[in-house]
């Protein structure tokens, strides 16, 4: 039978659903909200791929340079919500040059042209200017949600444009941004008829806000569920705001400090007593311990408590947390100490996530391994940990691994580099190996302390589901990196700093990088020659190098043996970016 006959036979044998119009499949795809499920289904045939493209309503771009904005808009024309991430994660620790890039403007301009019905925008670690915010306000007539996380480049003038122009805004969520205060009363730009706000978070804003305007806004937005205040809100005004919004589910208190007065305490206690729906509480910066009992009436209902900026310590903090028996998420400073975590262990057996931050990265420290061991033993639902401390033992890590094999995220940050087991003086290889061998569902891991290549051999062999790995001051040869890149079959992001890893494992495992989202290496043993070879070998990867500002010579003039201070490699379908600053060079 010839080719034509084969095609005819196949067409005749095709199931009847093959002839259904694309509109039917587009409707069917609306029942697959998960991106992984949609991607798997779209690979079945060309009509399903076409239907998935046309019906997609949400788009997440993990690297703003992985695709060209206008190509993304053209490929997915019906998007209503977009999330775009910019600078590498190590930007949070000051390792990425401030002028690296990640401008939001190209994405907003492309969205304005191709997604006129866009309702939501989220940017993380990107440069968002006032002009960007003005374009958002002017371009999308039904815009409802703006989330900016760890962004910079804008001011309160841009926020004023959002307030004045986005008449259907439901969420304005500003987290950990650097915002210039232009002394503009931007909250007053919300029209008096505006009532749609559900989330308002301006906790990162440094300047003053007009309290009267804020109170009027909160009063008329009856569906407001989340309110996070900055540290300029006086404590007596917090009580007034709570009386006007007793329906709040999440509250960021702001500074929470004032001279103690019994009448103010009574007002706060009464205000919190009226918040019957409050489930998530944060803030309490510089909290005065005498006011903490005002929280007691809401403790039983709290599922999330973020005190990562609260410097309160001692019995007052422990009394407070011991009343929060339904907590699922707890963020605190190490001022809680081991005794406080023992109370958490006995009181909060529904805990799922624990983060403990250092109060003084250079101080003596208040926390040991004991607190984490206690929590792991008593909280059966615990699956995510970020723990800063100054000492650890292999025995403790092995115990934690046995107690909680259900960990999906384990990030241990021992503040002093190359710190061994403080009892045996041995490397912490055995402890971290126990974590990856016991916790088979682990997706995110950060390791620290004195570690040899043996721990990387264990990670490469056992961490099959690991997606993100952070390594600092660890390993003793190229073998460590080789074990990671030749194993860890699900790895998407790898970030490394101050490790003795060089060219050989990078080039030997170059193909692995095409299956990953990104690789960051800084203060390692890489050379320019290896980066050149990698770029030639893997043309679909963008290979960026960053050296000290004083070393901005053209790459062509530098020999292969030139050390590379910082390397960032990522997969892209857009080709080399065109906005590289002087401190960044593409190989």
UniProtKB/Swiss-Prot annotation:
- Quick one: where's region Interaction with auxin-responsive proteins? 92-93, 358-363, 413-417, 472-473
Q: In which pathway does it act?
A: Protein modification; protein ubiquitination
Q: Which residues bind 1D-myo-inositol hexakisphosphate?
A: 85, 124-125, 355, 409-411, 444, 492-493, 517
Presence of the UniProt keyword Zinc in the record = no
Q: Which InterPro entries match?
A: COI1_F-box, F-box-like_dom_sf, Leu-rich_rpt, Leu-rich_rpt_Cys-con_subtyp, LRR_dom_sf, Transp_inhibit
CC terms in the record's Gene Ontology section = nucleus; SCF ubiquitin ligase complex
The UniProt record lists the F-box domain at 6-63
GO BP, one example?
A: auxin-activated signaling pathway
What's the entry's take on its domains? The F-box is necessary for the interaction with SKP1.
Subunit structure comment from the entry: Part of a SCF (SKP1-cullin-F-box) protein ligase complex. May interact with auxin and auxin-responsive proteins.
Q: Any extra remark in the record?
A: The myo-inositol hexakisphosphate acts as a structural cofactor.
Name of the protein in question: Transport inhibitor response 1-like protein Os05g0150500
């Amino acid at each position: 039978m010839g080719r034509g006959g084969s095609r005819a036979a196949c067409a005749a044998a095709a199931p009847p659903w093959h002839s259904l119009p694309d509109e039917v499949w587009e409707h069917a795809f609306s029942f697959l909200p998960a991106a992984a499920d949609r991607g798997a289904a779209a690979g079945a045939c060309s009509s399903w791929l076409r239907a998935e493209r046309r019906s997609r309503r949400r788009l997440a771009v993990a690297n703003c340079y992985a695709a060209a904005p206008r190509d993304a808009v053209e490929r997915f024309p019906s998007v209503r919500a977009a999330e775009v991430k910019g600078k590498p994660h190590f930007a949070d620790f000051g390792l990425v040059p401030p002028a690296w890039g990640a401008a939001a403007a190209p994405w907003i301009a492309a969205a304005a042209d191709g997604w006129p019905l866009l309702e939501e925008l989220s940017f993380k670690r990107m440069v968002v200017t006032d002009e960007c915010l003005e374009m958002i306000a002017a371009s999308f007539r039904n815009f409802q949600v703006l989330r900016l996380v760890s962004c910079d480049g804008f001011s309160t003038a841009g926020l004023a444009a959002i307030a004045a122009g986005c008449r259907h805004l439901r969420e304005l969520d500003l987290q950990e941004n650097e915002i210039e205060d232009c002394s503009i009363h931007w909250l007053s730009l919300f029209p008096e008829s505006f009532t749609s706000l559900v989330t308002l978070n301006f906790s990162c804003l440094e300047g003053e806000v007009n309290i009267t305007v804020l109170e009027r806004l909160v009063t008329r937005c009856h569906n407001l569920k989340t309110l996070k205040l900055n540290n300029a809100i006086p404590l007596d005004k917090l009580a007034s705001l709570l009386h006007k919004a007793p329906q709040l589910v999440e509250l960021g208190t702001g500074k929470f400090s004032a001279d103690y007065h019994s009448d103010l305490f009574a007002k706060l206690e009464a205000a919190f007593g009226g918040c019957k729906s409050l489930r998530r509480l944060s803030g309490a910066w510089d909290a005065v311990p005498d006011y903490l009992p005002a929280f007691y009436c809401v403790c039983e209902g709290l599922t999330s408590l973020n005190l990562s900026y609260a410097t309160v310590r001692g019995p007052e903090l422990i009394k407070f947390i011991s009343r929060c028996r339904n907590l699922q998420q707890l963020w605190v400073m190490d001022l809680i100490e081991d005794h406080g975590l023992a109370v958490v262990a006995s009181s909060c057996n529904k805990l799922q996530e624990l983060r403990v931050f250092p109060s003084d990265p250079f101080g003596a420290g208040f926390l040991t391994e004991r607190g984490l061991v206690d929590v792991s033993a008593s909280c059966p639902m615990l699956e995510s940990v970020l723990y800063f401390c100054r000492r650890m033992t292999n025995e403790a890590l092995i115990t934690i691994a046995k107690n909680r094999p259900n960990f999906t995220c384990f990030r241990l940050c021992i503040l002093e580099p190359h710190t061994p087991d403080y009892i045996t003086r041995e490397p912490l290889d055995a402890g971290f190996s126990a974590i990856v061998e016991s916790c088979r569902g682990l997706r995110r891991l950060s390791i620290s302390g004195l570690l040899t290549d043996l721990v990387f051999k264990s990670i490469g062999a056992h961490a099959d589901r690991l997606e993100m790995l952070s390594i600092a001051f660890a390993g003793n040869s190229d073998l460590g990196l080789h074990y990671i890149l030749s194993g860890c079959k699900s790895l998407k992001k790898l970030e490394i700093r101050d490790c003795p890893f060089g060219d050989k494992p990078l080039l030997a495992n170059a193909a692995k990088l095409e299956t990953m989202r990104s690789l960051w290496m800084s203060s390692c043993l890489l050379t320019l020659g290896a980066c050149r070879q990698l770029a030639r070998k893997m043309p679909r990867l963008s290979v960026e190098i960053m050296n000290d500002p004083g070393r901005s010579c053209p790459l062509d003039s530098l020999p292969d043996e030139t050390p590379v201070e910082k390397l960032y490699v990522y997969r892209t379908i857009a080709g080399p970016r065109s906005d590289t600053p002087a401190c960044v060079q593409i190989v």
